[in-house]
Design a protein with these regions (language model features):
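Glycine-rich phosphate-binding loops that contact phosphosugars or nucleotide phosphates
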Residues: 82, 88, 93-229
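Hydrophobic packing residues in well-ordered alpha-helices of helical domains and bundles
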Residues: 40, 44, 61-65, 92
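A short, well-structured juxtamembrane/interface segment
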Residues: 53-76
Length: 240
């Protein structure tokens, strides 16, 4: 039975698609003979076009930053979880580093965990459970009702990311997805998604990095606009 979710943006609820929707979701890997090789000019042109699709979603990224501020600065002092595969794993860790450390201005640290960074847990889960459990089991362990999970997938079809989105929603965790072109299973499984309209993996990843920085900028703006809700600590003023 599909389970409806609560949209934090106030929109109508939808149902999580049944598991069969996510079968056979691994991205196709082109062979050397069929792969189109881009020149530098081609790459820049593809990035320029993809940034146009991102520009149309700036309001969504601003809302995400404000949402993170509400969750991480709220009475429960919630947590951000983040995950992805390959290059998206590195970007997930980049996001959590910006919150535990800082983005621009000095401010207190906030709780943010990258689910790809703890190798012992990753290998233990991969050894003992199906591959789709790689992130989902960590979400169940670390996430709490009201927390936020950010998932990155250039294809939007990574089975372990989709499984993590489903597990998070079952546990009251808001899921935000950064993906490639829509429609895709991860965007459908998330509470909200920013989808980059480009067929090139590298271009999508580059736009995801811009999106992450925009989220951090919106987060900082929301936090620093209301300093009273952020407890001061020994780290303030310690930046070199």
């Amino acid at each position: 039975m599909a389970k409806p979710f609560r949209s934090y943006t106030g929109g109508a609820s939808m149902s999580i698609p049944p598991h069969s929707f996510f079968e056979n979701t691994v991205a196709d890997v082109p062979s050397p003979g069929s792969c189109t090789h881009l020149t530098g000019a081609d790459h820049v042109a593809s990035l320029r076009a993809a940034l146009q699709s991102l520009t149309g979603q700036l309001g969504t990224l601003d809302r995400w930053g404000s949402l993170l501020a509400d969750v991480l600065c709220g009475p429960a002092r919630g947590r951000l979880l983040a995950a992805g595969n390959g290059g998206s794993a590195a970007q997930a860790q980049h996001l959590t580093a910006e919150l535990v450390g800082r983005y621009r201005a000095d401010r207190p640290p906030f709780s943010a965990i990258c689910l790809t960074a703890e190798t012992s847990s990753l290998t233990a889960i991969a050894n003992d459970y199906p591959a789709d459990e790689l992130f989902a089991r960590q979400v169940e362990a670390h996430g709490r009702d009201g927390d936020v999970l950010v998932l990155l997938s250039t294809s939007g079809r990574s089975p372990n990311a989709v499984a993590a989105a489903r597990r998070a929603r079952e546990n009251g965790i808001t899921v935000l997805a950064l993906t490639g072109p829509e429609p895709n299973p991860l965007a459908a499984a998330a509470d909200d998604a920013v989808c980059i309209d480009s067929p090139w993996t590298a271009t999508v990843q580059e736009c995801h990095l811009v999106a992450l920085h925009l989220i951090c900028a919106a987060f900082d703006a929301a936090v620093l606009a209301e300093p009273a809700r952020v407890a001061s600590g020994p780290t303030l003023g310690a930046a070199r």
